[in-house]
Design a protein with these regions (language model features):
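A short, hydrophobic beta-strand/beta-hairpin element that forms part of a small beta-sheet core
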Residues: 70-83
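Eukaryotic intrinsically disordered and solvent-exposed regulatory patches
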Residues: 3-5, 59
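Thiol-based oxidoreductase modules, predominantly thioredoxin-like and allied folds used
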Residues: 40, 44-59, 68-69
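Structured beta-strand/turn binding interfaces of compact recognition modules in eukaryotic regulators
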Residues: 19-21, 50-55, 77
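Local sequence-structure signature of Cys/Sec-based thiol-disulfide redox active-site neighborhoods
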Residues: 7-46
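Short acidic, glycine/proline-enriched helix-loop-strand junctions
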Residues: 6-7, 68
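The conserved cystathionine-beta-synthase
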Residues: 62-63
């Protein structure tokens, strides 16, 4: 699957998607870790996380998809919330 299709599919099929560096259990940047903590403290569940460090194409494509240059990037109900 192409990176763009993977991103569109992830956003379409999950209520909450976080494109981040690392995983929810082991964030690999401070900002990604902060977003995870905020989401958990807010009581949100079923958060799909995508580790952009595992796929350089996804890492670059998500920036183009959102027209936003930084990661993490949070989508809720298919809407880009921010990064």
């Amino acid at each position: 699957m192409e990176a763009g299709d993977f991103i569109k599919d992830a956003i379409a099929n999950n209520k909450i998607v976080l494109f981040m560096k690392g995983t929810a259990q082991f964030p690999q940047c401070g900002f990604s870790g902060q977003v995870i903590q905020i989401l958990k403290k807010s009581g949100l569940k079923d958060i799909a996380t995508i580790n952009v460090l595992e796929d350089e194409q996804v890492r670059q494509e998500i920036k183009e998809y959102s027209q936003w240059p930084t990661i993490p990037q949070l989508y809720i109900n298919k809407k880009f919330i921010g990064g």
